[in-house]
Amino acid sequence: MKIQLDMYQTLAVAVLVLLLGNYLKKKIYFLQKFCIPAPVIGGLIFAIMTCICYVTGIAEFSFDDTLREVCMVFFFTSVGFQANLKVLKSGGKSLIVFLGLVIVLIILQNLTAVGLAKLLNLNPLIGMCTGSIPMVGGHGTAGAFGPVLEDLNIKGATTICTAAATFGLIFGSLIGGPLGKRLIEKHSLLNTTANDDDSLLVEDEKKHERHTNMYADAVFQLILAIGVGTIFTILLTKTGLTFPIYIGAMLAAALMRNICEYTGIATIHMGEINDLGGISLSLFLGMAMITLRLWELASLALPLIILLAAQVLLIIIFTYVIEFNIMGRDYDAAILVSGTCGFGTGATPNAMANMQAVCDQYVPSIKAYLLIPLVGSLFADFLNSLVITFFINLL
């Protein structure tokens, strides 16, 4: 039996799993302690149920992901509005260092994948199916490079890449929060949160306090940025490169924010925009989790499971040992670790959800909230594509 849910029903189910996740997180200390995002909790439970239904032949669920994309774009537009040039200037050095770390991570993921594939007597290109293509790249890059590998006689490359991206999505969501929390508590990092970035955030919040009657204006500003962003997206695609669909909206939002800040022509309602962005993120992640096809992981052979386990181990060691120390061993660095686990093995929205889960328990990190989406959405995909292309041609 095939059960087809339209976009309204899909959204309703996402809300139900989100509410379930919030309820379980409040009731189960373990989930709260390790900062597991609520959409991941409820979404995984639902995904396991649909997997059981599929395997036993009871039912196969099909979802309409139209609103998932809308929520994702709304969220990243809200992130774009956070791009205050004063904050970005103060974090210039951190941006360059973090970008360098991401490049190193991409290279290490592919070296690990290719090296292990050779040890397991697999075609190195099969190893690439578990490297940075699905890890840093996520489902989008997996869908783009899977057919390329199939053209190189790697049978089922798209399925392997997609399944690996699903694997990374799950584990990236599960390990990010606990790692960030452990670093914060182990090194008593809450006393390192007072810095220039945070003072700018406090100043910004004072200028943009929340008012109920301003939420409509905030929605209008988000929609306007998304509309203008489509023009930017069209221009970017003419370069021949592949960009996430939300990058144009992010750029438009950042432009609107700084023009308004500089000229005073209008007030950007940041408090309300941040609230709406948080809601959009929860809804997006809820819909992303309920549409996971867990049975695709069961079809992976043991060597591929080993390859994927190695990627999880790599991201843990890299973020916990290398990234945390290089990024300053402070609270911001711990939140960056949590976020990197999200987009380093899954997707930028998972990174944001990881950081939100940790920050909800402690305090916000404006540096992490700017660096992760900026690098994860704008630079990482571009650099990843270059590195992947280099490795494929080398092999």
Can you annotate each of these PLM segments?
Residues 17, 44-51, 64-92, 251-260, ...:
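Hydrophobic transmembrane alpha-helices of secondary-active transporters
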Residues 20-32, 78-90, 179-181, 255-270, ...:
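C-terminal ends of transmembrane helices
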Residues 17-18, 169-262:
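Membrane-embedded hairpin module used as a gating/binding unit in multi-pass transport
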